[in-house]
Design a protein with these regions (language model features):
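ALDH superfamily catalytic-core signature
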Residues: 1-121, 142-146, 187
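Conserved C-terminal structural/oligomerization subdomain of aldehyde/semialdehyde dehydrogenase
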Residues: 13, 111-235
Length: 235
């Protein structure tokens, strides 16, 4: 068997029914965990226009609560792994308008958690896995189609992600998950689906193949074979 965990662009959906304070707190943690350098980091946000302004304000407050007013002075805030990664991630700044963050320092490879809006959907920011603390934020509404249907159309039009995150009414989250495909995910949380060692983890499509953890790991990395032993006492 082949087991590949390949990453990808994991969407984060914020509906107007979401608890914005809790959403901001969990996303501030999930996006700054290792400065976004994790395979299942939330990659971009699809947010209902009615809660965008409140979320941006709450996200900024939660980042400060985690890392202090001067984030660059926080020795626990992770830097980019190397100069190439720093240059690649800061290069995304040109793909939209920064509405929060944007400070960086090449000497220490520091990049502040950054929200970017007005992003072209064919830009590198929206076509490459970010793997850093930069968060493109795309605003949707209920005009014409419902927010839910617009989210589904957007997600299924792109490669299947390694993770899928939804914040809002649980029943709506389950419906969106049923109508999309991803390696795994969370409703009203991020990252935590990987923490259960008894639950299978892996990607689908371009985000990977195969599953591991617990029994799935044993089966994935075991070779089974068929042997026939035939008697010779009669022929």
């Amino acid at each position: 068997q082949v087991v590949l965990e390949l990453g990808g662009k994991s969407p984060c959906i914020i509906d107007k029914t979401a608890n914005i304070e809790v959403t901001a707190k969990r996303l501030a943690w999930g996006k700054t965990l290792n400065s976004g350098q994790t395979c299942i980091a939330p990659d971009y946000i699809l947010i209902h226009k009615d809660v965008k302004e409140a979320f941006v304000k709450a996200f900024a407050a939660e980042v400060r609560a985690l890392h202090g007013e001067d984030i660059a002075a926080d020795r626990h805030y992770v830097r980019m792994v190397n100069d190439k990664a720093f240059e690649r991630v800061t290069g995304y700044f040109k793909d939209g308008d920064i509405i929060y963050g944007g400070r960086c320092d090449a000497a220490t490879r520091f990049i502040e958690p950054t929200l970017i809006e007005n992003v072209a959907l064919d830009s590198t920011l929206m076509t490459e896995e970010i793997f850093g603390p930069v968060f493109p934020i795309i605003t949707l509404d209920d005009n014409g189609k419902s927010f839910k249907d617009k989210v589904i159309d957007f997600v299924v039009s792109r490669e299947k992600p390694l993770a899928f995150y939804y914040f809002g009414k649980e029943s709506e989250g389950w419906e969106i998950i049923r109508r999309t495909s991803s390696g795994g995910g969370c409703i009203n949380d991020v990252i935590m689906h990987i923490a259960n060692e008894n639950a299978p983890f892996g990607g689908v499509g371009n985000s990977g193949m195969g599953r591991y953890h617990d029994k799935d790991s044993f089966e994935a990395f075991s070779h089974t074979r068929t042997i026939v032993s035939t008697g010779t006492w009669i022929d």
